[in-house]
Amino acid sequence: MIKKIVLSLITVLSFCSLALAQNKQVTGTVTDEKGEPIIGATVVAEGTSAGTTTGGDGQFTLTVPANATLSISFIGYETQKVSVAGKTHIDVTLGEEATGIEDVVVIGYGTGKKIGSVIGSVDQVKSEKIENRPSTNVVDALQGQVAGLQIMTGNGELTSTSSIRIHGLGSMGADTSPLILLDGAPIQASTLQTINQNDIASVNVLKDASATSIYGSRAANGVIYVQTKTGRRNQESVDVTLTGQYSMSSAVSPELNMMSANEMLDYIGAAVAVRLSGDALTTPDKIASGRQYFIRNFGLAKFMDENYNPMNDYKWWNEILERNAPMYQVDLSVSGGSAKTSYYFSGNYANKTGILPGSELDRYNFRTNIDTRANNWLRLGLNLGLGYQHSSVADTNESQGSLYVSNPVMASLITPPYQPLYDDNGQMLNFFDATQAINPLMTADYMPRWQNRITMNGMAFIELTPVKGLTIRSSLAVDAFDWRSHGASSPETPTPSGKFGTGSASELFQRFYEWTWTNTAEYKHTWNEVHNFTALLGEETLYRNNNSFSVASTGITSSRFLNIAMGTEVSGGLPTYSIAQSASNSVFGRLEYNFAERYFISGLLRNDASSRFGENNRNALFWAVGGMWNIKNETFLRDNQTISDLSLKVSYGTQGNSGIGDYNHRQYMAAGSAYGGYTTWMVSGIGNPDLMWESQNTLTVGANIELWRKLSLSIEYYRRQTNDMLMSIPLAPSGGYSGRAGNVGGMRNSGIDLSLNYDIYASKDWFVNFHATFNYNKNQLTDLWEPGLEFVYMGNGLQAYSVGDPFPTWTMQEWRGVDPETGLDTWTTADGGITSNFNQAALVNLGTSLYAPYTGGFGVTAAWKGLSLTADFSWVHGNYALNNTMYFVANADMGLSSQFNQCDLAWDYWQQEGDQARYPRLDQAINFDSRMLEKASFLRLKYIQLAYTLPSHIMEKTKFIKGLKVWVGGRNLWTVTGYNGLDPEAAEKGVDVDTYPNTREFTFGLEFKF
């Protein structure tokens, strides 16, 4: 019995020894991507109950099976799984969760913060609102997405740029564009609008002084911070994404309702009859008589048959503009990472044909983002973007013969429909007899225009963490481009008398580069777990160089060699060369404190020195303070299930603006024409050594609330006062100079931003969201350059500086309508009366502005399983534009003297007493007055997309493709407006005439993930 017991004990002990031999002790350290230890991370051996948490130094010790797999996790970080087979010690780096990164913003040189902990006014647009849009202009995708950010794409030209404004127009003469940062490096707005949209991870818009003052003078009009995509450390596999899309473009708006050939002849016949008879009433017999007179006496018989009926009836809009222009785009990106290094590489090619004849764009983009942590105290990185762009440009500024008739846009409207396109042999005509101009379809053949642009932008940085909480960083950023523009006119260009005989060519070169060297030290410390401090100190140096060269020649005799070397003489005077250089140096600092994530305060100082001002005024000190109360984190609200977020914030600060020419503080000379074999020199500008910084003071008060974790509302009030505005002060003409740079006047922008986001429904398979933005901005001049001066005409006869009104305010002869008794146009006189004599009409301040006081957008997103629908709208309200096109297409004078076709609005003319008409009797000239000033408000379906992502279990069967997404979409598909021009958005430039139309796109795309 005893023997059996002993043997049994030996057997049990043997099994226990074997079991113990299969377990082992593993130690390790868990850190974040900066090498900081993560305290409290959970370490678990999968499939067992063995687990522990990391201590104060991020270290752990755990006994686990010999071949166990450890799962390491921590809130806000991606879970890592590591096999311990053959290992007794492991070091693990946890990267932030991808979903969390989207809610992190980088403000003012420091490390990222959660949006909810930012005092300043900041809005974020995520990548899904930007990528895969059928446009080569990435900025266009931001329209309507951020309250207070106004994006206007004024035309559809392939290389055009959008205007960008944050909280209105901040100055009369200085730069009004926001600072653009790409991964922290400053770039030109033109560079931003050419980068690959699929490289963008997020766009952060900084709007108030607390968020922007740290950037100094360049951020006087706000900041747009663009973050590009990166790889992730410890990524198990390489992610490869291949995207391709095909789009078709057409003009965004249908043509104006232009007259047919018979309608045009009847209309002009009516005008002829009225002018011959003096009787404004037009009857069918009088119209027929006037029509025949017009045909016989204006050389139109060759376009008519024996019965004086037109042999052709072309809709020139359809011939010139109504075409589907294709766009092809392909994008390839590769991302991944090891324990120490993350990387992202991408390449993009886009080819887009314009809707105007002769316009085409080829663009190549390449990007490299590399980030490596050499050890726990050293981090290195490089972000680099390269681009090449070639575009053939449709010249919309060319005029020949009658005004605008060679401009393809205007020609599509005004070319008479009876003008044939082909000769008797079926060959396309190269010259139109009716308009005495080149066939607009062939303008690009005779007058080629093209542009090349090479861009480079990037930043290299080194980051040190010598002690816990201290980050020292040095970065060097570069933004550069080379631009070349070529234009020519062939000696074969047809004219009324034959051909030009000699051609011409011109070349323009521009080279721009800017480098920025930034050095910062940031220290973060938490004391007693509730007192959180952050201190930042920095220094920054910027240098900018911009030079250009242009030359033109004439006398080219061969259409085969249209370049400047083939000319016999230089045209337009001597070749021109210019170089502009500027530099600035800044020092700055910021202190931030929050108590238990409830009470936040911050303060910052920045001193800027700029070479654009004289020695006595080069330095300027700017500052900002801000505070926030996160009420949700109070004990009385922390557990409230209804209110999931509630905070109040306020900030006040000063900023400066140096966005003027580089040498306005100096008197300088320029080369003039040659005289006696020598180049002459002349004083080119009057310098102002007392020129100083334009200053701004900005107050912002805001509140954020979120209910049930699904409905959020943000509201902010702002007031931005600009003083000592930089502008050219008008001088007496007798002095020989039109103006001199100075600091004068004041301007105020005040308004409200509203942002709403509502997750209407969310379940396992369904998701429905609605979002909206709204901005009201009141812009007004507060004073001008002389005490008591309240109103000054701007010199263009259209606009004025007016204290108390928006800048600029429209100021024209005020049209008072057509007199029902006489059929004559009437206008306001200086004493407020009415006159039918245009020479007695006064210039009147109409109190309306070019810029809209109300802007916004809204959209919906709905998803069911793998199917999703997105629709985004944008709108503006209250802006006015001069619809100059109406002067040419609703004007009997233009129809009669130049044979310009007319639109159907022209039929609304006065004939007899009592008529209420828009246009006067047909023997009266149309004048340039406020009748052409129209409200350019609009609502536009900016983008819509229907997409389907195939289920993952289907993709897994391929063993190769991880994901597949297919979509169809459209841009600018629907517009509601009362504007009578081609496109209300084109009215952004103020005077709308011959503008390359905006485009609408239909697109189809595929995205593969490998």
For the regions a language model picked out, list residue spans one by one.
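Short, small/polar-rich motifs associated with maturation and membrane association
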Residues: 1-367, 379-381, 385-387, 457, ...
